[in-house]
Amino acid sequence: MTLDSYNIFNDEYLFNMPLSPLPKVLGNFETGQSVLTLTTPTLTPTTTRNIEDTLGHLLSDTQTDRVAGCAGFAVPKVLPNAMGAIDALGMGIPTCVSSLPLQQTYDASLGQGSESEDSNASYNDTQMNEEQDTTDTSSAHTDSTSYQAGHIMAGSVNGGGVNNFTNVLAAVSSSRGSASVGSSNANTSNTPARRGGGRRPNRSTNMTPEEEQKRAVRRERNKQAAARCRKRRVDQTNELTEEVEQLEKRRDSMRKEFEALTNSKKQLEYLLATHRSTCQKIRSDMLSVATCNGLIAPAGLLSAGSSGSGASSHHNHNSNDSSNGTITGMDATLNSTGRSNSPLDLKPAANIDSLLLHIKDEPLDGAIDSGSSLDRFPVTSNGSSINNINSIGNNMNSPTLNALNKVPKERPNTLAFQRPLGQMHLSMANNKAGGPTQIQGVPIQTPSTGTFNLVSLMDGGTGLTPVSGPLVPNSSSTNKHPLELPTPTAEPSKLVSL
């Protein structure tokens, strides 16, 4: 049941009681409805259907006359079973109702609605409340109290604080009656101010023709500037695209060139590797050395030496060595083809005899004693000193000749030394079964060759310190050369073997 049906019902039965002979009908309806509201305080679908059926039965005679004022509401047909249900509830309504009082009642309700017209604000509030109520389906909004936009119905004549259906219909009819008549005036009122953004209207009412012309010129100028900006962006994009394509083509060409060079390099390396195994020239160059007088010389000296003497026999007549004069082999880096032909800084090779001739003869130092070992070998010219050294090389006892002796000596097993006083007695000196007891006149002092006692140890020493006497300078030692002064290692060792 819509709000229009409520409006019609209230206009017919609530506000026009003196004009309609239905006071008893309303009394019976309120009595039956009061009992229903106690058990069902809300407006249920069953109650709504019963009200629609009752209104359809009452308005069947005047349906054609009031279709234009019902906002497109079509009253459904009356069903017999619905009427029976209403009679069973004690809500029977007599059907002998004349059409004339109803028509007068409808006209009177319209007149009252027009006199009690409200402002546009009340109409907007009512519309907002109705939309909120119809969209919300919660139990709080289906109640009759919340249905009236928060207005609580308190202290009615029949209900007394209870949610009375009659009071609900009266409140709704008051708002709807004023809204139905004032809808035409609401359409003709001024439009409210815009609350949000959005595009400006095409034409303002208070704009002069000059301002309109300026606006048109400004819009045209903005359009042209936007078109130029778009064209500039398109041109720049096209230029960048062309540049990228050119760079990609260049990259492809360079990649192909690199691949071609790599392939040629591999082919050359393969040919070189296969040629080295069968090349005869490399084998001959590995053994050829270009020399000049026993030294590696540049090409200039080689050519001069080969033209003047028989040095050409040492010169290899091939392309590598004849021009460079270098050692050739497997490594090509030794070949100095790209080097300059400037002569090397080499000293000329001279004979040893010519070098000995330039040695200056110096007199011997008078301070050297005649008994010195250096006095035995005077230096003579023309290499005679070498012959003297070789002739005297048989003497192995002289410490000065040991340095000149080139014959390898056998390494001794013990350290040779001499006893100072000869008081050490060997118990096995005459034992011929043992090994040799002397090496070059030096007795071998080992545990296997002699027996030591306390007397011999105290007489000869403990063997931990040198047993030679103190070094007393004499006239001969003072006059000797500094190289001939007695040192612990200048003569055969005087240390006891450990």
UniProtKB/Swiss-Prot annotation:
Bias (Polar residues): 108-127, 333-343
Gene3D superfamilies registered for this protein in UniProt: 1.20.5.170
Region feature (Basic motif): 214-233
GO BP: any one term: embryo development ending in birth or egg hatching
Protein's job: Developmentally regulated transcription factor AP-1 binds and recognizes the enhancer DNA sequence: 5'-TGA[CG]TCA-3'. May play a role in the function or determination of a particular subset of cells in the developing embryo. It is able to carry out its function either independently of or in conjunction with Jra.
Primary gene name: kay
Phosphoserine: modified positions: S342
Protein's recorded name: Transcription factor kayak
Ranges of biased composition (kind: Low complexity): 135-144, 177-191, 304-325
Gene Ontology molecular-function annotations: DNA binding; DNA-binding transcription factor activity, RNA polymerase II-specific; RNA polymerase II cis-regulatory region sequence-specific DNA binding
Assigned keywords, A-Z: Activator, DNA-binding, Nucleus, Phosphoprotein, Transcription, Transcription regulation
Gene Ontology CC terms: nucleus
A Pfam family assignment: bZIP_1
SMART domains: BRLZ (SM00338)
Assembly, per entry: Homodimer. Heterodimer with Jra. The kay-Jra heterodimer binds more stably to the AP-1 site than either of the two proteins alone.
Domain bZIP, first and last residues per copy: 212-275
Entry's localization field: Nucleus
Residue ranges, annotated region (Leucine-zipper): 240-247
Spans annotated as Disordered: 108-144, 177-234, 304-345, 465-498
Family: Belongs to the bZIP family. Fos subfamily.
